Design a protein with these regions (language model features):
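Short, structured segments at the rim of ligand-binding sites
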Residues: 1-423
Length: 423
């Protein structure tokens, strides 16, 4: 699907969608119980559907009533080698590999888009020496497939810290279910620490005990059971970051449903925007970011890589030079987001470059626009383009807009409600 985005002024109040990261985790905890759990504030997306399919393959059932999702946990016997379609969701795939080895003795994971090429060697290197059979192949329809067979056993597990935190979270979900005690150690320095803390928070809320013996080293008792714990899902700072950056660029947007008490690392968006010179007003779970005299800054993305593209746009329109550091993980997303961000900004008339794992931006006063952007197949690039267009002299065109369905299907409606123009 192709859309044209036009220069515009955005104004209004928006409720942040439910945190996708929290929803993944709470759904999995609910699915691993044998009871019923209600999650309110739930929002559909392609990634949520992927996690629901995988839980369904393990026997969970779902009922939707408005924004309330009721999950009935695993019931009855699990099919031998169930098939789990992960769509393009890296979180879903990496969370469920240890879970499937624990409760099903293996499975066939189906992967679409770039997911089949995203790194999985961390698990392969961890599990194959422990007797798990691991096979990457291609299904009859051309989709990538990963087949794993075997059982996880209690023991001492060590992961490097410079890999996706999703691998750590997958083990944290599964290890408490094993018939014996285990330890999990993540070697420092650790990437995306906040996401690990979010997983520990979610499993603890479901009655799982994890004992931190030292920094990034946990003792995890076995024979544990997940307990039902209904909750209201918090707003998503990762998605809200797009609107907060729009505010820093001169639009007048208030975002609600954002708790100041959160393990979401992407709350760093507020700190980073203030470092660029924006003003942040926060009260009663409402956030309003106002434009100041934006200036260059050095911003560390190691714990919040998902907000780097939209921050790069904001820094591109600030005076002076900015540098976004530790952006290497962007290369391993739905597209190479580091390269795509630099390419988009330069096509629009900016001055950006990749310097190793950093993005360097030389500020410009105005973006030109007037171009057709490639189809990146990435929801973050769609949101980046839509906000960039509001600050361009001429409209911009982009193909592959349907990628937005992966995380925020209602985004374009929200964008237009705020005054954004696209057709």
């Amino acid at each position: 699907m192709k859309k044209t985005f036009f220069p515009a002024h955005l104004i209004g109040t928006v409720s942040a969608p439910a945190s996708k990261s929290e929803a993944h985790r709470r759904m999995i905890c609910a699915g691993l119980t044998q009871g019923e759990t209600m999650l309110t504030g739930f929002m559909d997306s392609a990634d949520m559907a992927a996690t629901m399919r995988c839980l369904g393959a393990l026997g969970s059932t779902f009922n939707r009533d408005g924004d309330t999702l009721t999950i009935s946990g695993m019931q009855g016997k699990i099919a031998k080698m169930p098939v789990m379609d992960c769509g393009e969701s890296g979180s879903t795939l990496r969370f469920f590999v240890p879970i499937a080895l624990t409760v099903a003795g293996g499975t066939v994971f189906r992967m679409h888009g770039r997911l089949g090429s995203r790194p999985m060697d961390v698990y392969r290197d961890l599990f194959v020496p422990r007797g798990v059979r691991w096979y990457m192949g291609v299904g009859a329809d051309g989709a990538a497939e990963l087949t794993v067979r075997g059982k996880m056993e209690p023991g001492d597990y060590v992961l490097p810290g410079n890999v996706s935190s999703q691998f750590v979270s997958g083990l944290l979900f599964a290890l408490p279910l094993l018939p014996g005690n285990s330890t999990l150690t993540v070697q420092q320095p650790v990437e995306s620490e906040s996401y690990i803390r979010m997983t520990i928070e979610a499993i603890a809320a479901s009655g799982i005990e994890v004992q931190e013996s030292s920094a990034f080293s946990w003792r995890i008792p076995g024979h544990q059971q997940y307990r039902s714990r209904s909750c209201h899902l918090n707003g998503d700072y990762s998605q809200a970051a797009v609107l907060c950056c729009a505010g820093a660029l001169g639009h007048d947007i208030t975002v609600t449903h954002l708790s100041p008490v959160t393990t979401q690392g992407d709350r760093a968006i507020l700190r980073h925007l203030m470092a660029l010179g924006a003003t942040v007003e926060e009260s009663d779970n409402h956030i309003r970011v106002k434009a100041g005299k934006l200036h260059g800054a050095t911003l560390d993305m190691h714990d919040c890589p998902d907000i780097a593209p939209i921050l790069a746009l904001t820094a591109q329109l600030a005076e002076g030079e900015s540098r976004l550091t530790h952006c290497g993980r962007l290369r391993l997303k739905e597209c190479d987001r580091l390269a795509a961000t630099v390419e988009i900004l330069n096509l629009l008339g900016g001055n950006a470059q990749a310097d190793g794992d950093d993005i360097v931006l030389h500020g410009v006063k105005q973006l030109r626009g007037g171009v057709t952007l490639p189809n990146y197949g990435d929801h973050r690039m769609v949101m980046l383009a839509s906000i960039a267009a509001t600050k361009c002299e001429q409209p911009i065109e982009m193909d592959g807009i349907e990628a937005i369905d992966k995380s925020w299907p209602e985004y374009l409606k929200v964008y237009q409600m705020l005054g954004g123009k696209c057709e």
